[in-house]
C-alpha cells in the first residue's frame, strides 16, 4: 500500500511514493525557474508547474516500479501565498505572483488605512498583520496596475490547489494556505466576508469549497491517470502549504516541538492550541495547522537557501559548470570551502535579504550585503558567513518565540540546510539548541503523503499518521565555546539592520 505526495516548491517539484512504514519507495524531481521581470517581482507559470509536476510523478512511478493499483491516494504540499488567476473557462490569465514577490508594499499601506478608517480590527480576524506577499494586497495591486486582467478574474487559487484542479477538474481552497490570504477568519477557520467587503474584493473570487487539509478535493481524471501511469479515480487530498506539510512530515504536531527548515526560503515553525497573534508587527505568521484543533506559527526568511544558490550561480559559476559535467554536487564543495573558516567567519557578516526581509523586520526594501570585508577576507569566510547569516536570520524569530515564554532547547531541522553537517552544527551553535534530523528527508512531500493516508482512511488523524511514520535520525549538540562567540556576533548582526534601514529605503527610492 502506497501514497503519493507531491510537493510544489519554488525551485522544483518533488513526487514521493511512501509506504505505510514511512519508507520512501521512490522519488521524482524536476526543476523550474523563477521569473523576475522587475526588482522585487517574482512570478512563475502555472502551465509550467503542470509540465514539471507531470515529469516528477512519471519519474517517481517508473523509478520505483510501483504497481499503480497500490497507490491509494495523492496528497499535496505547495509553496504558499502565490495567487493563480483563472477566467470563467478555467484558463490561467497571467503568471502566478508567488510568495517572495514584494510589489504590493504600497497596497499594504492602503489596506491599513482602510482598516483604520472603517474600524475593522484585522489582526483579531486574520491573526496576522498584512504583508505584501498575501493575496489581498496582490489583488489590490492587480486592480490598480492590470485592470484589464483583474476584470476577467473568475476564480483565484493557491498554487497546489491549481494542480489539484488540473488533476480532478474540481476547485477548492484549504484553510492552511488561506490563512495567509488576509481574507480568512483564522481563529474560526472560515472566510471572513467582512474582509472581502472592506477591501471590495468579490466573494465569488474564491472557490465554493473551503477544506481542511485532509479532505478530498476530487478524483484523479482518466486522461491524467493515463498520462502518469496511475489508476483513474484515485482520491486526491487537498493537503496544505509546504511549511505546514513539512511540520507534519517532521513531527511538529505538538506544542512542545519546534522546527526550522532551510529551502529557497527558511522558516522557524511551531504549533499551538490557539492562533499565535503577534501584536508587535514582527511578521510572525499564524496559520491553521493540518488538523482542525491546532494552529501553527512561522517566521520567514525570504531568500535563505536562495543565498547559497546565488553563491553557486554567481561566485562559483565556472565551478558549477565543471561539477555538472563531472556529475558532482557543487553544494558539497561550497560547504567544504566554508569548513575551512573559523567560527564567526573572521568578522564577516552576511545579511540574507536578496528580496527583502519578512520576520521579524518586515521590510520589503531590505537587501543582502556582506559586512566586515577586508583585504585578508577569504573565500572560506564568505561561504561560511552566508551559512551563518541565514542561521542568524532564523535566530531572530526564535528569540521572538522565547520572549513569549516558550522553552526552545531542541529544534527539528529539514530542507537543504539540514543535509550539511556543518550547517547543522552552525545552527546548533547559533540557536543554542540541540539540532535533530528526521529519518525522512523530504519533509513536505512526506507530510503530503501522510495527509493522503489520513484522507483515504488509513490513519484516523494527522497526529496518528505522523507518529507512525516520523522517526528521529540524528542529533547534534551546541558547542559551548561557539555559542559564546555567536552570541556576540548575533548582537552585531541585529544592529546592522537597524543601522542600514534608512539606507535600504534610500536605495529603493533611487531605483524605482
Which residues does each PLM region occupy?
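Glycine/Thr-rich phosphate-binding loops that ligate phosphate moieties of nucleotide
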Residues: 1-29, 35-36, 72-114, 148, ...
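Divalent-cation-assisted or electrostatically stabilized phosphate/pyrophosphate-binding catalytic cores
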Residues: 45
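Glycine-rich phosphate-binding/catalytic subdomain of phosphoryl-transfer
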Residues: 41, 55-326, 333
